[in-house]
A protein has these predicted regions:
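Conserved CoA-thioester-binding segment of acyl-CoA-metabolizing enzymes
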Residues: 1-24
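N-terminal glycine-rich phosphate-binding loop for ADP-containing cofactors
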Residues: 4, 42-45, 52-55, 61-62, ...
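Glycine- (often His-adjacent) and acidic-residue-rich active-site loop
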Residues: 25-68, 87, 117-119
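Helix N-cap at the beta1-alpha1 junction of Rossmann-like dinucleotide-binding domains, i.e.
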Residues: 28, 108-110, 323-325
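Conserved catalytic cysteine-centered active-site region
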Residues: 68-81
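Gly/Ser-rich catalytic serine loop of serine hydrolases
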Residues: 81-91
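Short glycine/proline-centered loop/turn elements that form peptide/ligand docking sites
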Residues: 89, 107-114
């Protein structure tokens, strides 16, 4: 806890026999960030109290941490951070409070301030020490505003750490700084400190800040309080001494924590995601289902994307389409993705070939034998879906899961075409599959809890985020999507200028404007969905 850390630091500082302190972790990560549910650090439990008292509690708690880190900086003893693994969020802010930072030379290690990704701002000096070390550049603003992590080498070139070394030499390198009489004072505490790159009121600084403000407004439409607070904290803080700057950061941190938008982001993007990774919503009474082979019916854009992310997880894929050329084209989708990664040195030829070897493009349904899961990804047409369902179920075992990637058609109705409706479930991916993290799992009227558990195990294996929803036309996401894009088209028909419609959509917090989104998903798809919906309503007498 923070209290235990404070007690240890105070003892080390007061012990005259201690000439310097090396901070390292006994775990694989140095520190991968603070616990965002910690009331000691963030005070989320106090937000529900009287607003003034809550703000005071959060501010005072934050300043306690700020003062603790300042005591390290001003102790007169050199502190060295030996970064053996990920140093993120508060973990990296501890490093920033050290006088020297040495990291293992490993590109898999992440160094960064990812708080903005979950709606918060660095709250232990990150907005003040980072720019004092590295200046305010486009790269550094991305580091803070977007939470983009650096590798140790990149952090070194940016000026955020002082040295990279081999794992075996990490502690020796850290000790060497102390033994060699390394400074025990931070640059900003030295007389004559000059801010790297120029302050905001210099000509160069004015250009940087004007561009940063404009870019932030363009990308966020002021919907994200954390990014605005980070920019303000840096702008104001770099113009005053460090102690005043840390108080500025603490005030902005308090303001952000008190903001309902930030609280919602923390809940959705951190707390709930942590719960999902631990099996929330998964039925508890069933063993883990290890999917080793799946069949994908339909090798179009969606089916091809599903094939890629599934093979990437090490699962064998049988990719079926009406003719061999179409199936081969579906596999080619994965080839193109991997070739692009290869050109950027994000994969190797060996890894590429291994992934592609897992995808078998074919027209032969008999190759589905032994599949643990089927994903149907054909057009939104009931007749076609019924046909491929029958062909696939004739080949698979009675325990295999059959999932439909339908975006709008009720699962209970589609399950009527199945010989085993208890094993039938909706698995709705989003395009492009390799980039979109969400998968919607839809429970039909007869879908069993075991089928739900198996499906959630598969979705987590391919590293997607599952949400479980009830069965109704459009489910959850497509109903939101349809309403959003439909309203945009309706406004256009009423004569409202497209630019106004698009800006209004972005101002609501949506990542893409409604008319642009309609174009991106293809208007013919909307027509097919509408046509099938009309047929269904007529059949139901509606």
């Amino acid at each position: 806890s923070l209290g235990e850390y404070r007690s240890i630091i105070e003892k080390l500082i007061s012990d005259e026999s201690v000439k310097g302190i090396v901070l390292r972790s006994a775990k694989d990560a140095f520190i991968a960030g603070a616990d965002l549910t910690s009331s000691e650090v963030f005070g989320f439990d106090s937000v529900q109290e009287d607003k003034v008292k809550a703000a005071e509690k959060i501010y005072n708690g934050n300043m306690d941490m700020q003062l603790l880190f300042r005591s390290m900086e001003t102790s007169g003893k050199p502190f060295v951070a030996a970064i053996n693994g990920h140093a993120l969020g508060g973990g990296f802010e501890i490093c920033l409070a050290c006088h020297y930072r040495v990291a293992i030379d490993n590109d898999k290690i992440q160094i960064g301030q990812p708080e903005a990704k979950v709606g918060l701002i660095p709250g232990a000096g990150g907005t003040q020490r980072v720019p004092r070390l590295a200046g305010v550049t486009q790269e550094i603003m991305g580091f803070l505003l977007a939470g983009t992590p650096f590798t140790p080498k990149k952090a070194l070139s940016a000026g955020l750490i002082n040295e990279v070394t081999d794992a075996d030499n990490l502690i020796n390198a850290a000790k060497k700084y102390i033994v060699d009489g390394g400074k025990s004072v931070q640059p900003w505490d030295e007389k004559g400190f000059r801010f790297p790159g120029g302050l905001p009121y210099t000509p160069k600084g004015a250009m940087i800040w004007a561009a940063a403000s404009s870019s932030l407004r363009k990308n966020s439409y002021n919907n994200y309080p954390a990014q605005t607070a980070i920019l303000s904290a840096v702008y104001e803080g770099v113009q005053v001494p460090i102690d005043a700057a840390l108080r500025i950061e603490a005030r902005y941190f308090t303001k952000v924590v008190m903001d309902p938008r930030s609280q919602n982001m923390v809940r959705s993007l951190f707390v709930n995601m942590q719960a999902l990774s631990k099996g929330a919503r998964r039925p508890k009474d069933f063993d883990k289902y290890d999917v080793k082979k799946i069949g994908i019916l339909g090798a179009g854009l969606m089916g091809a994307g599903i094939a890629y992310v599934t093979a990437k997880a090490g699962i064998e894929v049988v990719l079926i389409d009406m003719d061999q050329a179409a199936a081969e084209k579906g596999k080619e989708y994965s080839t193109k993705i991997l070739d692009k990664q290869l050109s950027k040195k994000k994969t190797t030829e060996e890894k590429k070939e291994k992934l592609l070897s897992l995808i078998t493009p074919t027209t032969d349904y008999s190759l589905l034998k032994g599949a643990d899961l089927i994903v149907e990804a054909v057009f939104e047409n009931r007749d076609i879906k019924a046909d491929v369902t029958a062909k696939a179920e004739a080949q698979i075992s009675e325990t295999a899961v059959f999932g439909s990637n339908t975006s709008t058609l009720p699962i209970t109705g589609l399950a009527q075409n199945s010989s085993r409706p208890a094993n039938f479930i909706g698995i709705h991916y989003f395009s492009p599959v390799e980039r979109m993290p969400l998968v919607e799992i839809i429970m039909g009227k007869e879908t069993s809890q075991e089928t739900l558990a198996k499906t959630m195990d598969y979705v987590q294996k391919i590293r997607k985020t599952p949400i479980v929803v009830n069965d109704s036309r459009g489910f959850y996401t497509s109903r939101v999507f349809g309403t959003y894009t439909g309203e945009g088209v309706a406004m256009l028909a009423e004569g409202i200028k497209p630019a106004l419609i698009e800006n209004a959509g972005k101002m609501t917090g949506m990542p893409m404007a409604p008319l642009a989104l309609s174009d991106a998903v293809a208007l013919d798809l909307a027509w097919k969905v509408t046509t099938q919906t009309k047929k269904d309503f007529e059949a139901e007498g509606k």
